[in-house]
Regions:
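Conserved catalytic-core segment of NTP-binding enzymes
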Residues: 84, 88-89, 95-192, 196
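Histidine-centered active-site loop/cap adjacent to the catalytic His
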Residues: 204-225
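Residue-level signature of catalytic and energy-coupling elements of molecular machines
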Residues: 14, 22, 52, 75, ...
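Hydrophobic alpha-helical packing residues
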Residues: 1-3, 135
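Switch II (G3) loop of P-loop NTPases
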Residues: 16, 31-37, 54-70, 74-104
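C-terminal boundary of histidine-terminating zinc-finger modules
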Residues: 194-206
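Conserved aromatic anchor
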Residues: 246-248
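Phosphate-binding loop that captures ATP/GTP phosphates
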Residues: 3, 7-61, 72, 170
């Protein structure tokens, strides 16, 4: 919303197919899309942003039990069959990992860059490192790192307890020579705002998460669009080697 408040035209694409959370965060958890008109889906508008998510297509209690290729087809449809109109920025919320969805996105559109979100513990650092290296392989710039769950702040206190460890995001930023965009501690009021769909209201706009968004905005707006888009991204027959073909 920091971008929308700066009068930019913003879209949010939630491609966490198996666990979409954006609809709840913007107060549209019960919203369901109607059918496509002539094969085109209209994004939902909230807080000055256009939003599309699997959460608008399936009810809360409906599990999405899809194999990777089907999920990849949905990503392609969200990119090509949604009437986004004219946008300055399209932000994509991806699931954790380095699977079909990430590869499909990398193959389908040229991306300005990626922001890596991790948590402080060592095991999360290892997983984030794989994501960092994947984006490097497909030549997508990494704009910076955000450390989530960076300590617990009890209600009515400013003291931070590092119950999940400390420094995982900073360590990754130093290892890969990347900007550390900020740290988000666990706060009851922020959790309640996300659950209630009020995280983007005026009462919460000065939260630490919003301040980090402003910092990220400065990085993104200074990053030129990557002119590179891979011609083909596939897994080799051994199931372990990523094969990337670039245009001449």
């Amino acid at each position: 919303e920091a971008f929308a408040n700066a009068e930019a035209k913003v879209g949010i694409l939630d491609i966490d197919v198996y666990g979409p959370s954006i609809p709840n965060m913007v107060g549209l958890g019960s919203h369901q899309l109607g059918g496509a008109q002539e094969g085109v889906l209209e994004p939902v508008e909230a807080h000055g942003m256009k939003i599309m998510s699997m959460g608008f297509l399936a009810t809360k209690d409906t599990p999405v039990v899809w194999r990777g290729p089907i999920a990849s087809q949905l990503v392609q449809q969200f990119l090509g069959a949604v009437d986004w109109g004219e946008l300055d920025y399209l932000f994509v919320d991806m699931p954790p990992g380095t699977g079909d969805i990430q590869l499909t996105l990398s193959q389908t559109v040229p991306l300005t860059g990626a922001v890596i979100v991790t948590t402080p513990q060592e095991i999360a650092h290892t997983i984030a490192e794989k994501g960092l290296r994947m984006f490097q392989q497909v030549k997508i710039p990494i704009l910076g790192i955000v450390e989530n769950m960076a300590g617990f702040t009890p209600p009515g206190s400013d003291e931070i307890f590092h119950i999940f460890g400390e420094g995982g995001g900073t360590s990754a930023a130093e290892e890969f020579d990347l900007p550390m965009l900020g740290k988000i501690s666990i706060k009851q009021e922020l959790r309640e705002a996300m659950d209630n769909g009020t995280v983007f209201t005026d009462d919460n706009i000065n939260s630490i998460a919003s301040l980090i968004a402003v910092e990220a905005m400065a990085v993104v707006t200074n990053e030129e669009l990557s002119p590179f888009a891979p011609q083909e991204i596939n897994m080799a027959n051994d199931g372990e080697t990523l094969v990337i073909k670039w245009q001449d």
